[in-house]
A protein has these predicted regions:
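Beta-strand segments within the central parallel beta-sheet cores of soluble alpha/beta enzyme folds
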Residues: 37-39, 73-78, 110-122, 200, ...
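Alpha/beta catalytic cores of group-transfer enzymes, especially the acyltransferase/condensing modules
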Residues: 112-162, 252-254, 258
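Glycine-rich, charge-dense phosphate/pyrophosphate-binding loop(s)
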Residues: 209-308
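Acyltransferase
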Residues: 160-242, 246-247
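DPxDG-like acidic metal-binding loop motif
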Residues: 88-112, 117, 139-141
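ATP-binding N-lobe of GHMP and related small-molecule kinases
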Residues: 1-86, 104-110, 141, 297-308
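Short, well-ordered amphipathic alpha-helical segments that serve as non-catalytic structural scaffolds
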Residues: 54-64, 202, 240-243, 277-278
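Short, conserved charged micro-motifs
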Residues: 32-36, 179, 269-275
């Protein structure tokens, strides 16, 4: 899974985390370009679209075209372990895994930035919006900074020292078209003073992440543009932020487009304490939630062989 934005880093900062993951298997054979999703299982499989609307199918279609591969059929199996429509980069993770699995089956060198670019375009074709931050984190792993907003993707990994994370996901019914809705509420114009403040917050976020400056990081996690517009759509937003801070979190943010939230701490022990406070926040708010302590995860991994 991945968590994007991290406060003031809207659409340009994301981190891969080990709380949840997807798995994709592909089998390539001679054929005429058919891509068939033969199996979907896992704890969140019931919310996965079927047919051509499935992100895995679309990602493989685009990958075959990008690699100029013809005369093959592809059978796909998806194990869906990331909650759907929860702000955890689930569709992007599936797309990245599918493309990487195809590359492995074809014994082609793994170009992680190219994978991210194709996966982002697959998301755009299915959901209307690419999320290059999420897919880049899923492909490269770690915490990533986007240096471009469209393909070819330019990105850098940033080493994250002494940080642990708490991922909290309220158990609510997935909202169809949620990401599009959450983008519509974002302001389209800004006063110059707000733009400058937003830029300063992004500077603080990057400085804090790069150098481990907790004070700067705390400031950078407090967005002044996107989060204020979205917060009213996030269950228990204010109480989760408040309780997490009481537990010792550096700060808490909406993960992607929500409804999940991400709290950042300075150690695993501190994360466990914050997780306890976040669980209490949802209880006091009257909402069931799954709360997990997470570490930074590596990028997509490929295994070649097996039964496909």
């Amino acid at each position: 899974m991945s968590s994007a934005n991290l406060g003031s880093g809207f659409d340009v900062v994301a981190v891969a985390l080990d709380s949840y993951w997807d798995s994709v298997k592909v089998k390539v054979s001679e054929g005429s370009g058919n891509i068939v999703l033969t199996e979907v299982n896992g704890p969140f499989s019931s919310h996965v679209p079927q047919g051509s609307n499935n992100i895995v199918v679309r990602a493989l279609e685009l990958a075959l075209k990008a690699f100029n591969i013809e005369g093959v059929d592809v059978e796909v199996k998806l194990w869906k372990g990331i909650p759907v429509s929860s702000g955890l980069g689930g569709s992007g993770a599936s797309a990245v895994a599918a493309i990487a699995a195809l590359i492995g089956a074809l014994r082609t060198p793994l170009d992680r930035l190219m994978i991210a670019g194709i996966a982002g375009l697959a998301e755009a074709s299915v959901a209307g919006e690419p999320h290059f931050d999420n897919v880049t984190a899923s492909s490269l792993g770690g915490l990533v900074l986007l240096l471009s907003s469209k393909p070819p993707i330019l990105a850098k990994r940033l080493g994250v020292k002494d940080l642990s994370f708490v991922v909290s996901t309220p158990i609510v019914k997935p909202i169809e078209g949620k990401t599009g809705l959450m983008r519509k509420v974002i302001p389209r114009t800004l006063d110059l003073s707000v733009h400058i403040e937003s830029s300063a917050r992004l500077s603080a976020l990057l400085y804090g992440l790069a150098l481990g400056d907790v004070e700067a990081l705390s400031r950078g996690l407090e967005d002044v543009v996107v989060e204020p517009a979205r917060s009213k759509y996030i269950p228990c937003y204010d109480i989760v932020k408040s309780y997490a801070r009481r537990g010792g979190a550096i700060g808490s943010v909406i993960s992607g487009a929500g409804p999940s939230m991400l709290s950042i701490t300075t150690s695993k022990d501190k994360a466990l304490e914050v997780a306890s406070w976040v669980e209490r926040a949802y209880r006091d708010c009257g909402v069931d939630a799954v709360v997990k302590v997470a570490d930074v995860a590596p990028g997509v991994e490929v295994e070649v062989g097996g039964d496909g």
